[in-house]
A protein has these predicted regions:
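Beta-propeller-forming repeat regions
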Residues: 1-117
Length: 117
């Protein structure tokens, strides 16, 4: 399978001195013709998976989708845990979609959404 994005970020997101794995996997804008087009962003900690972003569409909707990426990891609140700011870029010149996820009760939750704009 052809991925247009596959990144793994090793980073201590929650301040426990252990690095979590943050995965970004996408096949949006692939040169192949897969049945489905997808974006996934997820965190793996202690063999548990927390999905932040999951978009799946049929191939014919590929150019209506955006390609997900991690834009920033930043501790905005100063509490030692990092917010995850993601972006999603379109093939055309549409505006980028920016979302933010924050660690609450040991799970990342979306606190700023593209739908909020």
């Amino acid at each position: 399978m052809d991925y247009t994005t596959k990144n793994i970020i090793n980073f201590d997101l929650d301040g426990d001195n252990k690095k979590e794995k943050l995965f970004v996997i996408s096949n949006v804008f692939t040169t192949e013709s897969p049945k489905d087009i997808f974006n996934f962003i997820f965190v793996v900690k202690d063999n548990n998976i927390s999905i932040l972003k999951k978009d799946i569409e049929t191939y014919d909707k590929m150019y209506n989708m955006c390609q997900a990426y991690v834009a920033y990891l930043v501790d905005l609140t100063g509490n030692g845990t990092y917010e995850i700011i993601t972006g999603c870029g379109y093939y055309s010149n549409k505006e980028q979609c920016i979302e933010m996820y924050q660690l609450k009760n040991k799970k990342y939750q979306k606190v700023i959404s593209c739908e909020d704009e």
